């Protein structure tokens, strides 16, 4: 679609580190830009506003901001938030799973990843441990694993462990500290862990352009964490195992691979028209 108006960058793309309700929208550069953006938006005709809305949809996990503020179909909080954490699908459902593809008639194509490699930008950047500095509001993270484990500590109110996680750049130690979180409830964690990984990876990839471009370049291929040891986030098999190419033979659930595919879908939707914006 070729726009008929000069376009202004939507706030969630202008400030990719900001969450929906951050104080950053109420002070400083975020507040100033938001007022500037909405003043500009109100100068558009209804037809132009509809055109802009089609070009730049809100991120799916911004549930209380919509182009039409008086909509009656605002998401129910109990469906889209859990312990204050936004989820992407109603009640935190998974968009993809092994069942999605296991009986597919199409020839499936895979992208395997596992260990990080800070020296290159290739499939290793899909690892939770890959160095990939990004921010979420006022917090800066070394990698997606740090975000995940820090959110785990926050969820259960363990400020001491949260601080330790945020003070290290060693992903292995982050994971170990995450296992020490006090007041841990596995049932609560199971309800929200997938959404935490979705959120963290959205911020990671939207703030690291080379990595984002690589993620988008995988098209509709199935992303696979080929960890022979992880049967939850990975497939429990190495990439060289012939069973890795047969989803029915996977020993694990591949939650990380499927989460990254969902992140890929969302980034593709939200950023599909950024080339139309002024540099």
Q: What are these language model-derived features?
A:
Residues 2-279:
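Charged, low-complexity intrinsically disordered segments
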């Amino acid at each position: 679609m070729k726009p008929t108006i000069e376009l202004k960058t939507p706030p969630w793309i202008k400030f990719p580190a900001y969450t929906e309700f951050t104080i950053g929208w109420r002070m400083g550069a975020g507040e100033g830009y938001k007022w500037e953006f909405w003043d500009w938006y109100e100068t558009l005709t209804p037809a132009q506003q509809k055109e802009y809305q089609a070009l730049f949809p809100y991120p799916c996990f911004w549930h209380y901001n919509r182009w039409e503020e008086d909509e009656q179909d605002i998401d129910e909080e109990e469906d889209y938030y859990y312990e204050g954490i936004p989820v992407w699908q109603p009640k935190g459902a998974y968009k993809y799973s092994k069942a999605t593809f296991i009986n597919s008639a199409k020839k499936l194509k895979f992208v395997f990843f596992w260990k990080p490699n800070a020296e290159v930008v290739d499939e290793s950047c899909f690892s939770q441990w890959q160095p990939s500095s990004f921010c979420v509001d006022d917090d800066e993270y070394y990698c997606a694993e740090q975000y995940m484990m820090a959110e785990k500590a926050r969820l259960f109110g363990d400020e001491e462990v949260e601080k330790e996680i945020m003070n290290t750049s060693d992903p292995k130690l982050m994971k170990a500290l995450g296992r020490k979180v006090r007041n841990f409830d596995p049932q609560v964690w199971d309800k929200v862990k997938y959404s935490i990984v979705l959120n963290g990876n959205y911020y990671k990839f939207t703030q690291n352009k080379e990595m984002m471009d690589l993620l988008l370049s995988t098209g509709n291929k199935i992303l696979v964490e080929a960890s022979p040891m992880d049967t939850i986030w990975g497939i429990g098999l190495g990439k060289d195992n012939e069973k890795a190419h047969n989803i029915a033979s996977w020993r694990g659930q591949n939650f990380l691979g499927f989460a990254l595919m969902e992140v890929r879908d969302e980034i593709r939707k939200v950023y599909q028209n950024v080339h139309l914006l002024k540099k």
